[in-house]
């Protein structure tokens, strides 16, 4: 009886020591898991911040582009250009906005997946705590564990599973980085195409505006200068008057020059009439001063 009691007493301290070792090992594992969890959270925070900043920038850029498109639409409508090209650009801008919103949703889903993986890591830590509590309960009841090597096996399996999951998370992180780089490249390509189309529309609008101005000038010249040319090219007008008026009309650019020409022509006509009257009056005076014999001859 005494030998049995001594053997049972010697067995209990060895069990207590092994349980203490297991407890310490599990505590270390839990601390390691907590540190890794904090590292993952710290890695996720800058990604979230970058995602939010990029989304804000994209939304602000889209708003500015919509405003510029509206301004261009107003300008094109004022200049009489076709609105179909502007409507197409607006549709393209709306499609770009929808694509960006879809990609943002995908990024949010990926962030949620990362958060779920962190929760899975927490569940693993809880599962590791479960055998700890069982061992403690068995010790309190005075029952010996069936196999002291079993918790170590479970711990090694948990470590392996955790390491595999960490590797998977890193692979997924690298894949997300590559996808993000591709997304940025596609966004830059779309922005460059969009800017190129806007520049082409501006060039076409300027060309149409110049054509409209040329037509207006030609109509203005036809309406204002052709009647004056017809009036000045009448058969009753003198040669000198025709030459001066034609020179003035070809060199003139507005109605003010035409009015000046009219006044000059009128003064020239008055001057020629006055010179003719002076000549006739001088001749009559000379004839009256001559004697009658000279007139008879």
From Swiss-Prot:
- UniProt superkingdom: Eukaryota
Keyword Coiled coil recorded: yes
Give me the ranges of the annotated region Disordered.
122-161
Name the keywords, alphabetized: Coiled coil
According to the UniProt entry, the coiled-coil residues are: 83-117
- Biased-composition ranges, Basic and acidic residues, are 135-144, 152-161
Does Transcription count among this protein's keywords?
A: no
Q: What is this protein called?
A: Coiled-coil domain-containing protein 196
Q: What is the native source organism of this protein?
A: Homo sapiens
Upper lineage is: Eukaryota, Metazoa, Chordata, Craniata, Vertebrata
